[in-house]
Amino acid sequence: MNLNATLFAQMVVFLILAWFTMKFVWPPLINALDERSKKIADGLSAAEKGKLELEAAHKRVDQELSQARNEGQQRIADAEKRAVAVADEIKAQAQAEAARIIAQAKADADQQIVKAREALRGEVAALAVKGAEQILKREVDQAAHADLLNQLKAEL
């Protein structure tokens, strides 16, 4: 192999080029690559963070929906309880009103019975007097009356 000056010159030029590249060209390339990898890493971490935030938001939404469902069910249960209480109260009022009406009707019936009895007593007494009067008119004659009156005079 023949080593001549051009080979050495090419080696020197290559070494100068390598040194120049390492000194002036390589650092900006490395910096650009580092910045690019940093941006990619930041983007990936931001994507991961966004994914975690999305999952957390989904969990919050699920919790809020669950809470809203529970509150809705609780409100429905409360409304049903109030409705039952109101219905029971209305039933109690209706029963009390029915009892009052029944008691009033019984009192009115008793009062009418008493009035009817009094009226019947009066009628029976009148009929008895009338019947006795008619019996006395038929059975007792003037001679019997005169004899009874004479007997009463004698006893007095």
UniProtKB/Swiss-Prot annotation:
GO terms for molecular function: proton-transporting ATP synthase activity, rotational mechanism; proton-transporting ATPase activity, rotational mechanism. The keyword Transport applies. Signal peptide: none annotated. It is found in: Cell inner membrane. Keywords: ATP synthesis, Cell inner membrane, Cell membrane, CF(0), Hydrogen ion transport, Ion transport, Membrane, Transmembrane, Transmembrane helix, Transport. Gene3D superfamilies: 6.10.250.1580. One of its GO terms (cellular component) is plasma membrane. This is ATP synthase subunit b. The lineage of its organism: Bacteria, Pseudomonadati, Pseudomonadota, Betaproteobacteria, Burkholderiales. The gene is atpF.
